[in-house]
Amino acid sequence: MTTLSPKDVVIVDGVRTAMGKSKNGMFRNVRADSMSAELVRALVKRNDFDTNEVEDIIWGCVNQTLEQGMNIGRNIGLLADIPKTAGGQTVNRLCGSSMQALHTAAAQIMTNQGDVFIIGGVEHMGHVGMMHGIDINPEASKHYAKASNMMGLTAEMLGRMNGITREQQDEFGYESHRRAWAATQAGRFDNEIIGIEGHDAEGRLQLCTVDEVIRPDTSMESLAKLRPVFDPANGTVTAATSSALSDGASAMLVMSAQKAKDLGLKPRARIRSMAIAGCDAAIMGYGPVPATQKALKRAGLTVEDMQTIELNEAFAAQGLSVLKALNLLDKRDIINVNGGAIALGHPLGCSGARITVTLLNAMEQMDTEIGLATMCIGLGQGISTVIERV
């Protein structure tokens, strides 16, 4: 384990909601800002610290309208009874929004612009559709391929470029569900999931503590029967090898190492490096490759040094293409060990902090020291974070 410097950015804790189905799911009657506020309250209670120390609440959210509008980051702080002296902001880097929230807080800590931050993200894709209110510039097709706005087609492109077969994708999707359900049954999500009240299929109030999107009965045989959904004539990407539409929130408590010591809080990890990178919008799923290469270089590490990895599974074709480019195809046993977004869902603004929290818990369960969280971002970006247990 590493020795901390006073200005090291440390992760004290991280939590998330269970992931709910967006269509008639368990959070169908729960607002995005309400579930986020519940999560923040639970994070504060679990760590028992003086919230007057909070500099800012930084929340990732992609479609910032309706219940997710009017600076949801600030609204969450007020709903969660965080002192009004703390600020609140909402950030949008599409799929990487809540990982960007983490990066923003880390940068402020590193530059003496605050010591304690609550970060996280949310997306209620059942209440606020992914394309709600979106008006793409008609001239955009002069600058990048029109299909770049259709995430499934970008996955098809990556799959063809990298020779990813339909069977490989089906196996990847099957394994995501298998691992996620095994993790659920073994209690490996218990430390990260905070129960939020929702409703069962009959409308009865229930405490939601199990990811609703996982399909325990998934089999290779059932996946093989599905038709391609984005390119019906020639495609290989199906609904089962795409991340599910879902509702959920995630949150983390981050601060300087010195402030954690002053408050008597034990850090779980420190941030070693962070990076953003762009790529062609038509192959947006490739973004984790250059972002990870940057982050590793900044940390003075190589991909071989990574002991546990969380890669957001936007699509199986995309995930496998990234693993191929990073020479990680033969290291699947350390990647998404508890399943990924194909099984758990991908609530856009939630996912960045969610995979970082899941990574940290997996590292503790496997007793590894160095880990990587990385994800692709629509319109051609990638974001990566390297963390080290302390």
Curated annotation (Swiss-Prot):
Belongs to the thiolase-like superfamily. Thiolase family. The keyword Ion transport does not apply. Heterotetramer of two alpha chains (FadB) and two beta chains (FadA). GO terms for biological process: fatty acid beta-oxidation; phenylacetate catabolic process. It holds the Pfam family Thiolase_C. The keyword Lipid metabolism applies. GO terms for cellular component: cytoplasm. Keywords: Acyltransferase, Cytoplasm, Fatty acid metabolism, Lipid degradation, Lipid metabolism, Transferase. One of its GO terms (molecular function) is acetyl-CoA C-acyltransferase activity. The gene is fadA. This is 3-ketoacyl-CoA thiolase. Pathway: Lipid metabolism; fatty acid beta-oxidation. It comes from the Bacteria. It catalyses: an acyl-CoA + acetyl-CoA = a 3-oxoacyl-CoA + CoA. Its EC number is 2.3.1.16. It is found in: Cytoplasm. It comes from Psychrobacter sp. (strain PRwf-1). The active site is at C95, H346, C376. Catalyzes the final step of fatty acid oxidation in which acetyl-CoA is released and the CoA ester of a fatty acid two carbons shorter is formed.
